[in-house]
Amino acid sequence: METDIPARLDRLPWSAWHWRVVVALGVTWVLDGLEVTLVGAVAGALIRPDTLALTEQQVGAAATAYLAGAILGALVFGRLTDLVGRKRLFLVTLSVYLVATLLTALSTGFFSFALFRALTGAGIGGEYAAINSAIDELLPARVRGRADLAINGTYWGGTALGALSTLVLLNPNVLPPWLGWRVCFALGALLGISILLIRRHVPESPRWLLLHGRSEEAGRLLRDIEEEVTGRHGPLPKA
């Protein structure tokens, strides 16, 4: 049994491999900031008679549905990530988000809009549960705190992206109102697809594998990581 896996992960110098992990997993905060901003920014468009013709109360209820879905998603997926693994869950939760936000763009009334907002929230809530564990287990302990702070700060990048997107897409001189709000939500799906392609190359957490008695698999994964890092940074220090 390879019991030095945690120490070997912690000794790794910061590398392109770590950047890939941070970008692929840390985008969750960007997506959340984007979604929270979008629903407020498109509210004016959603109450128009030529769009969904929602009331202000229904717009508020849809925002509540998103938050409720996020709480439920965090609880459900948080439990599952310990059972079935980090990688499987962070692929599933991103897929849930991707499909749900795309369906939001195709909503035909209040019920479908609120339902898909709840599912979008569930995907984001599940993302937080799966991603926090994966990031903490894949990054060296010495940089974990700073990395977490930097990643959390990207939430505001998502809000800025949402604000800028709606400023353009909700402009009737750019797109008609019935189409503009739908394209706004479709942006999240496009971003999700690109990130999903990157995440496919992020490995399962060797720490999780070790904890679940799969030490040989954890060792193989870690050797692959070490080989990539060594190719760029030279010999590694002793664990």
Task: Indicate where each model-derived feature is located.
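Transmembrane-helix signature of 12-pass secondary carriers
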Residues: M1-A239
